[in-house]
Amino acid sequence: MWPAPTAAPVEEPTRPTVQAVLCVSDHPNPPGAARCRICSDVIAAQPARDVPLPVLALLRASNGHVAEVDRPVLIGRSPSPDRSDAADPELLTVTSPSHDISRTHLEVAPSGWDLVLTDLHSTNGTVLVTPDGKTRQLDPGEAVVVPLGTAIELADGVSVLVDYPQ
């Protein structure tokens, strides 16, 4: 009898790492942080260490859909993973009754501890509303770092909030 064939091991994609300091509840935070970004506890002085990239934000679409940002997230009315350089991007589908939102409208991706939003040459553009209420129209293809609390206005009355992780 021949031995049964074995399947080739499936390689899990490796998650990127970041330098971090941990609070007493082991939440990862950017080096130099005084308080935890999750629980607000004081962070004791400590050397930074490499940790897997944590969830940096939650994207809350006005249709109720939510995506975690721990890898690139493509947002649109029918987002296609082909529009990202990432091996396995998250897809966040939003409604667009008038088809004013592009199929793959924009990408929100982690870059270290930053969140980089890129308009993917959308037809009707992307408007950002920062936490202090300032608005900014992105140019097609423009990439910007966005803070937590930013609202992303797409079209058709659809918006996405860049919210704090839980």
Report residues per predicted region.
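Intrinsically disordered, low-complexity acidic Ser/Thr-rich regulatory segments
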Residues: M1-P97, P147-L148, V158-Q166
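Short polybasic amphipathic segments
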Residues: V55-R60, G125-L128, I152
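Forkhead-associated
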Residues: R71-L148, A155, D163
